[in-house]
Amino acid sequence: MAKKNNAKSAAGGNAAAKTEKKGKNQISQQQARANAARASAKISPAPEGPAPAISVLVPICNSEQYLEQALDSLAAQTFTDFEALCVNDGSTDGSLDIIKRYMEKDQRFRLIDKDNSGYGASMNLGIDTARGEYIGILEPDDFFEPNALELLYGLVKGASADVPVDVAKANYWFYWSTPKERNQLISVCKPPMTDAPFNPRDVREVFYCIPSVWSALYRREMLVEKGVRFLETAGASFQDLGFQFKVWVTAQKVVMSEEAILHYRQDN
């Protein structure tokens, strides 16, 4: 019996080792793919003049069905001092043509065109390219309220300047366009977190919040200096979890609003 158990244990150990090796190989291959896509990416030049207050990252991969609504919501912002970095992740539909149309109409729209390498790699290249003091995120099937950037930047500038605001965050709606248009408020930001600026390590409730990375602004200098990045895994699933956790353990000052600013599509 002991010999059989030992044999089973050895077999199990070998299987686990093979699985671990396979996983490491897949990660290495994905990282190599992301690095190659980054190296060959084509980035449109920034317009002359001072850097914008906000850089909004729009990660795009075969998103033509909803992309115009997303970009229209950016173009209609009441706060105008921003650049929109449209990161085309190897789209094979009409997404690239849509981006180019917006670039022709509005110099605030810029293109980062790269081979497909996943959501995380797209976001990190956007962070590296961004020039704004703060970075926002708009996914291509969602859309902002017209005052979204104005509200978030107002939170930043309305706080005392002794310590810079690292994160400004607001609420959002779940959104359905079919069979009938409707919104459902999702209250991530609520008292006591909305009462005053806070350090996330002092308010543990923030670590249990849904990681809605696209209803916020992040201070670019914090992300760059502290190495806060997205995981460059394949596809577009759950990269926001790791990013949000790293933001909370890094940020020194967070401000929140109970107002909702973004429609997060559920029928895509």
What residue ranges belong to the model's regions?
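Short Lys/Arg-rich cationic patches that frequently serve as NLS/NoLS or arginine-rich RNA/DNA-binding motifs
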Residues: 1-40
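Nucleotide-sugar donor-binding/catalytic module of glycosyltransferases
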Residues: 27-268
